[in-house]
Structure formats: structure tokens, C-alpha cells
Curated annotation (Swiss-Prot):
Pfam families: Ribosomal_S13. Residues 109-126 have a biased composition (Basic residues). Located at the top of the head of the 30S subunit, it contacts several helices of the 16S rRNA. In the 70S ribosome it contacts the 23S rRNA (bridge B1a) and protein L5 of the 50S subunit (bridge B1b), connecting the 2 subunits; these bridges are implicated in subunit movement. Contacts the tRNAs in the A and P-sites. It comes from Aster yellows witches'-broom phytoplasma (strain AYWB). Part of the 30S ribosomal subunit. Forms a loose heterodimer with protein S19. Forms two bridges to the 50S subunit in the 70S ribosome. It comes from the Bacteria. One of its GO terms (biological process) is translation. This is Small ribosomal subunit protein uS13.
Length: 126
């Protein structure tokens, strides 16, 4: 397993697919990086030379990936909440942010239904 950007990349997969295991690198960006470095996209990670791996590491450091990207996203959301923006309020309430309706679905954001379950009624003995 090769280690790039603090992530162990699976060695039996193709390089294009393996790069997508890094948070912030999708299919399109991995294609772009490999084209810039002139590395074959169908080659397996285990067949890469040390020079190619080091070139990949250097190229990936140019992009905002993994911990830095996660931190940036959370800080952006926190900033929206602090300034009182509508999107920040939606994040705070745990509701959809991008204008979706909430009458029916939106369960992935809202979580499980919090319906009140009636307790068992006890008989009063007089």
C-alpha cells in the first residue's frame, strides 16, 4: 500500500480509482493529475515506481485535500452560523440547506422521526 496525503491507497487498484480514496480528489481531478504527470491511468498502484509516487505526492500537495479541506468546510459552515445567514440557521436546525421541501422527505438530514410513543395506561385501583 502506498501512502499519499496521509492515506493508505490500495495497491491492487488502478491509479485513477485509488486516488479517489483521498478526500477532495474525485475522478475528474485524478484524471487531470495523471495527465499532467504523464502517468498511465490503467497502471496499478503496486506497479508505480518511487519516482512516480513522489511526483504524485508533490502534485497532490498543490491541492486542498484531506484534513485541510475538511477543516475549511467546517469553518465555512461555522462562519455561516455565526453571521446568522439563512444557510447557517438551516445547518443549526439540522434541516436541508439548499431549498428542498421538508414536508415529506429530508430524512437523511433530519434524522429518524421523533414521534411521541404513547405509554401503557395504568389502571387506577380505588
Amino acid at each position: 500500500m502506498a501512502r499519499i496525503a496521509g492515506i493508505d491507497i490500495p495497491s491492487d487498484k488502478r491509479v485513477v480509482i485509488a486516488l479517489t480514496y483521498i478526500y477532495g480528489l474525485g475522478n475528474k481531478l485524478s484524471h487531470k493529475i495523471l495527465n499532467e504527470l504523464k502517468i498511465d491511468q490503467n497502471i496499478r498502484v503496486k506497479n508505480l515506481t518511487e519516482q512516480q509516487l513522489s511526483a504524485l505526492r508533490i502534485e497532490i500537495t498543490k491541492y486542498n485535500v484531506e484534513g485541510d479541506l475538511r477543516r475549511e468546510v467546517t469553518l465555512n459552515i461555522k462562519r455561516l452560523m455565526e453571521i446568522g445567514a439563512y444557510r447557517g440557521l438551516r445547518h443549526r436546525k439540522g434541516l436541508p440547506v439548499r431549498g428542498q421541501k421538508t414536508r415529506n422527505n429530508a430524512h437523511t438530514v433530519k434524522g429518524k422521526p421523533k414521534a411521541a410513543i404513547a405509554g401503557k395506561k395504568k389502571n387506577k385501583v380505588n
